[in-house]
UniProtKB/Swiss-Prot annotation:
Any Pfam family hit: PAE
Enzyme class: hydrolase
GO BP annotations, alphabetical order: negative regulation of canonical Wnt signaling pathway; negative regulation of Wnt signaling pathway; Wnt signaling pathway
Protein name listed in UniProt: Palmitoleoyl-protein carboxylesterase notum1
Positions of the catalytic residues: S226, D334, H383
Gene Ontology molecular function: any one: protein-containing complex destabilizing activity
Source organism per UniProt: Xenopus laevis
Tissue specificity statement from the Swiss-Prot or TrEMBL entry: Expressed in the egg and through cleavage to gastrulation stages. Enriched in the animal (prospective ectoderm) and dorsal regions in early gastrula. Shows a dynamic expression during embryogenesis, in particular during neural induction and antero-posterior (AP) patterning.
Glycosylated residues, chain numbering: N90
Enzyme Commission number, as recorded: 3.1.1.98
Catalytic activity: [Wnt protein]-O-(9Z)-hexadecenoyl-L-serine + H2O = [Wnt protein]-L-serine + (9Z)-hexadecenoate + H(+)
Major localization class: secreted
Cellular compartments annotated: Secreted
Highest taxon listed in the record's lineage: Eukaryota
Species classification: Eukaryota, Metazoa, Chordata, Craniata, Vertebrata
Length: 488
């Protein structure tokens, strides 16, 4: 609120400097902040008495100066954007290497909404590839080098222009240091050499946040990207149950899963499970769930035979068992899915069989999302989106992701969980129907792996072997227009 008022003050000051002799005609009016500028906690507004302005500019300027002095200095606004690191008080809940886990927090006084974000970053499924991960990506296995503060973007941004509906929430970022898709519950032992406590880390953070204002929360949105997105599906009901057990049943727990809705499909080319990148999704999770001593939600676990709990790591299998509302954000042509399926789009144009595999992947993913009440699925080749600064630019059928989330939020306020009946002009079940990667004109730009140059949609599709020029010529239109027509 202070930031918006600072801008207002500067505009008022500059206006009155130029036109100091102008007489105000409106009387008895006040400047009232817009809905965006008001905090949801009902923060006090700062009225200006325009009745004293007419014929007395000195009085008006005195009010402006008094108001300005009562606000936080404009020059220091950006300093408050940082999230501060908090190491967990419970030292038994640790990262892979035994160092204490923690979280970053940016409080928003007066807000009763909390956004808790789970970071992504693959996983490791054996002592050998965990050792390699520790050598090359130690930040994802240890808290020892975490900075004392960090800034965030996308849905974690505190700037209204970048984060229209959640900018004023209490922001929590939980770094990923358990390498277990946020599912583990096993401490470090001499035999294993590593701890896998992802699920316990989430629980411990939630407990600590209760003492920092979460106890008065109205809504807790558990969000995550990639492995964090899958972590949301695995933990959202667990968090809801935990809060209820601790005596806070009134906190509405919801989930937002970004790029964590993977398919257990057959790879394009079958390879041995020698590393996590080429290992088939089902085999990787089957190995991992044993190695991590994973916690799987009981309601999902009951749907499968003993030893087949790994099925719960796949979104379309666990989603029907969830009691908490979940919004699913998923690219129809997710780069991580294509990677584990051994589909490589760099180098020479793809073969026909590969092209057909890619198209079929989009169809399969679309089918798994058709019964998901709240979803946003653009036909793009990308991975992760909600923490990207450009997340407001992606659209499906003319609706942006922040807008769809806001519509979902409004629907939940009416207590119609997972309803696909949209509010008038406010949809939240959105999927592209066009059949190939990047056919949505709002997709993030992609770059040539070798030259680093940005590729247009037409160039990319031609690279894949799709003759855009020929098809456009047959239709008597420009390639760009053809893509727009097909996308809409």
């Amino acid at each position: 609120m202070a930031g918006a008022l600072c801008v207002t003050l500067l505009l008022l000051l500059s206006t009155n400097t130029v036109s100091g002799r102008k007489t105000w005609r409106r009387r008895g009016q006040q400047i009232v902040p817009s809905g965006r500028e008001r905090s949801e906690g009902g923060d006090e507004s700062f009225p200006l008495d325009f009745t004293a302005v007419e014929g007395n500019m000195d009085n008006f300027m005195a009010q402006i100066k008094s108001l300005a002095q009562s606000l936080y200095p404009c020059s220091a606004q950006r300093l408050d954007d940082e999230m501060k690191l908090h190491i967990l008080h419970n030292k038994s809940v640790t990262c892979n290497d035994g160092s204490s886990a923690g979280y970053y927090l940016k409080e928003s006084k007066g807000s009763r909404r909390w956004l808790v974000f789970l970071e992504g970053g693959w996983y490791c499924i054996s002592h050998e590839n965990c050792d390699l991960r520790y050598d090359t990506m130690r930040r994802l296995m240890s808290s020892k080098a975490w900075p004392p503060a960090k800034t965030a973007s996308g849905i974690l941004s505190t700037q209204p222009e970048e984060n229209p509906h959640w900018w004023n929430a209490n922001m929590v970022f939980i770094p990923y240091c358990s390498s277990d898709v946020w599912s583990g519950a096993s401490p470090k032992t001499e035999k294993s050499g590593y701890a896998f406590m992802g699920s316990l880390i989430i629980q411990e953070v939630v407990k600590e946040l209760l003492g920092k204002g979460l106890d008065a929360a109205k809504v807790l949105l558990l969000a995550g990207s990639s492995a964090g997105g899958t972590g949301v599906l695995l933990n959202v009901d667990l968090v809801a149950d935990l809060l209820e057990e601790l005596g806070y049943p009134g906190i509405q727990v919801r989930g937002l899963s970004d790029s964590g809705w993977f398919l257990d499909n057959k790879q394009y080319r079958r390879t041995d499970c020698t590393d996590i990148i080429t290992c088939a999704p089902t085999e990787a999770i089957q190995r991992g769930i044993r190695y991590w001593s994973s916690m799987v939600p009981e309601r999902c676990k009951q749907q499968f035979k003993e030893g087949e709990e790994w099925n719960c790591f796949f979104g379309y299998k666990i989603y029907p068992t969830l009691r908490s509302p979940v919004f699913v954000v998923q690219w129809l042509f997710d780069e991580a899915q294509l990677t584990v399926d051994n589909v490589h789009l760099s180098g020479q144009p793809v073969q026909e069989s590969q092209w057909l595999y890619i198209q079929n992947l989009g169809r399969e993913l679309r089918n798994t999302l058709k019964d998901v009440g709240a979803s946003f699925a653009p036909a793009c080749l990308a991975h992760e989106v909600i923490t990207r600064s450009h997340w407001t630019e992606i659209q499906v059928r003319g609706t942006s992701l922040p807008r769809a989330l806001h519509c979902w939020d409004r629907r939940l306020q009416e207590t119609n969980k997972n309803s696909k009946v949209p509010l008038k002009g406010c949809p939240f079940h959105l999927m592209d129907s066009c059949p190939w990667p990047q056919c949505n004109p709002t997709c993030p730009s992609i770059r040539d792996h070798f030259t680093g140059q940005e590729m247009s949609v037409v160039q990319f599709l031609m690279h894949l072997g799709f003759d855009v020029q020929k098809m456009a010529s047959q239709q008597g239109m420009e390639p760009g227009k053809l893509l727009g027509v097909l996308s809409s």
